């Protein structure tokens, strides 16, 4: 078997669909505190998307109807790193964000699931166990 050269060298952005771009921009910018780095807009047209920086990957919110794509919220969460899940959760709850269940302690990390205004599943995440100490590290 001949191996092909690895064509993919990284992840440029993760797309998040939205039905209401202005509401979604406000949520990611003001509620989550992410830095907006771009607004996608053709001259004379309505905006069709925006990008937010997380420090490791860009989140691109897209008005999918403007791209001819039917809206479907993400049901697999995007995990946002935070230093303290409990503190970040309390801050978001004080802003009106509703969480799905209690904070999870997996033995490796803490995480808390919530949704953006369009129902896209998001996750506050903090890994407290170094990867070498993970229970499944020997199996991988």
Question: PLM features: residue spans?
Answer:
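Exposed loop/turn and edge beta-strand positions of beta-sandwich/beta-sheet ligand-binding modules
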Residues: 46-48, 74, 108
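Active-site beta-strand termini and strand-to-loop segments that position acidic
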Residues: 51-55, 114-117, 127
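Core segments of cupin and vicinal oxygen chelate
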Residues: 6-9, 15-58
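Conserved beta-strand in the GNAT
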Residues: 60-62, 113, 123-125
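Vicinal oxygen chelate
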Residues: 18-22, 78-121
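N-terminal beta-strand motif that seeds the catalytic metal site of vicinal oxygen chelate
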Residues: 1-25, 76-78, 128-140
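Short beta->alpha transition motifs characteristic of CBS
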Residues: 38, 105, 124-131
């Amino acid at each position: 078997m001949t191996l092909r050269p690895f064509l993919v060298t990284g992840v440029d952005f993760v797309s998040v669909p939205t039905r209401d771009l202005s509401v979604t921009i406000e949520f990611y910018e003001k509620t989550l505190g992410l830095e907006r780095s771009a607004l996608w807009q053709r001259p004379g047209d309505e905006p069709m998307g925006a990008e937010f920086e997380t420090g490791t990957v860009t989140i691109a919110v897209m008005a999918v109807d403007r791209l001819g794509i039917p809206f479907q919220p993400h049901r697999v969460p995007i995990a946002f790193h935070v230093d303290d899940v409990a503190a970040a959760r309390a801050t978001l709850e004080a802003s009106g964000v509703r969480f799905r269940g209690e904070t999870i302690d997996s033995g490796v990390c803490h995480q808390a699931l919530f949704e953006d205004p369009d129902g896209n599943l998001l996750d506050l995440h903090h890994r407290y166990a170094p990867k070498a100490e993970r229970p499944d590290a020997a199996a991988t």
